[in-house]
């Protein structure tokens, strides 16, 4: 049998932490370990059609993948053209036309839970992670049900975020973050300006030649198919309080608070309360599910229904990513 549903008693997959509501992720196993995914493509698609929009995520395990190109074909088999990583916020390496490395932050850094590109008005509906090499220690890709996060956020905070929305401010380059050339995949300023105008991003070229952008985006969103409300933003990640205190103080002393690589405010420009951000981080932590990767695993997520992150790790680790099905708030 292809699909191996999670244990209904505690909703846990082997080492998946118990005590979290809902069967996330749903697990789909190869009938015979090592079978090529191509031999079961139709069954794989049926598993996704039946389960992705209810559980939010599917872990495909024990299927054989030859390389990143084979993974790209797997992601394409669900019927959507794969997306490029436009308006990037983190460093990645492009492996082929539509497959990227996962965020290349140092191994000692945690990447907090987030929905891909929820800092913008455009995002992918589907995202796939393929584990090519497991880290000897750590390196999990934690996930969390964004519907459950929405429900657990204090109603007053949730309403305030929803009403005011969020303004993301980014300062590119100067060796502190991605250059504008990296973020927009171009050396042409006019192309950057065209992209910004099309996507409702305010921009300014600073005296040092670097770029600053501002964009007002959603804090919550309604899934276009299921109609469910989800917590859908990266305020906790972009806010300056997400930086370690020593680094934060050093950055501010050098470039001023207005010049830090990234920050976020309410949509009207007013500051977000630190207590609200700590509450959001606490809810995300309490809702997080984590499981050890196995080499060859593919995790498929509905990007609106499920957030993802990255744990610290030791040793070599390789996880690659593909995205599909563009969605927009405008």
Feature map (PLM): residue ranges:
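A gly/proline- and charged-residue-enriched helix-loop-helix capping module
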Residues: 83-115
């Amino acid at each position: 049998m292809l699909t191996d549903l999670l244990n209904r008693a505690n909703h846990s997959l082997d080492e998946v932490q118990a005590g979290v509501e809902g069967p996330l992720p749903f697990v789909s196993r190869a009938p015979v370990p090592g079978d090529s995914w191509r031999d079961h493509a139709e069954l794989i698609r049926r598993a996704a059609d039946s389960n992705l929009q209810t559980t939010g995520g599917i872990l495909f395990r024990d299927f054989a993948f030859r390389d990143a190109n084979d993974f790209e074909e797997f992601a394409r088999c669900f019927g959507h053209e794969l997306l490029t990583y436009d308006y990037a916020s983190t460093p990645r390496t492009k492996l082929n036309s539509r497959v990227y490395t996962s965020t290349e932050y140092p191994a000692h850094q945690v990447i907090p839970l987030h929905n891909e590109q929820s800092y913008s008005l455009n995002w992918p509906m589907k995202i796939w992670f393929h584990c090519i090499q497991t880290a000897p220690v750590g390196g999990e890709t934690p996930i969390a049900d964004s519907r459950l996060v929405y429900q657990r956020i204090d109603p007053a905070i949730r309403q305030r975020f929803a009403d005011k929305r969020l303004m993301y401010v980014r300062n590119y380059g100067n060796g502190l973050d991605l250059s504008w050339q990296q973020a927009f995949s171009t050396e042409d300023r006019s192309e950057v300006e065209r992209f910004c105008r099309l996507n409702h991003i305010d921009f300014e070229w600073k005296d040092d030649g670097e770029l600053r952008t501002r964009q007002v985006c959603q804090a919550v969103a309604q899934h276009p198919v299921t109609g469910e409300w989800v917590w859908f933003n990266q305020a906790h990640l972009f806010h300056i309080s997400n930086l370690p205190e020593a680094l934060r103080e050093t950055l501010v002393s050098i470039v001023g608070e207005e010049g830090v690589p990234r920050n976020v405010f309410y949509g009207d420009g007013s500051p977000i309360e630190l207590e609200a951000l700590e509450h959001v981080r606490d809810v995300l932590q309490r809702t997080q599910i984590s499981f050890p990767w196995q080499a060859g695993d593919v995790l498929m997520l509905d990007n609106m229904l499920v957030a993802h992150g990255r744990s610290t790790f030791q040793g070599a680790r390789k996880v690659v990513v593909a995205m599909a099905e563009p969605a927009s708030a405008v």
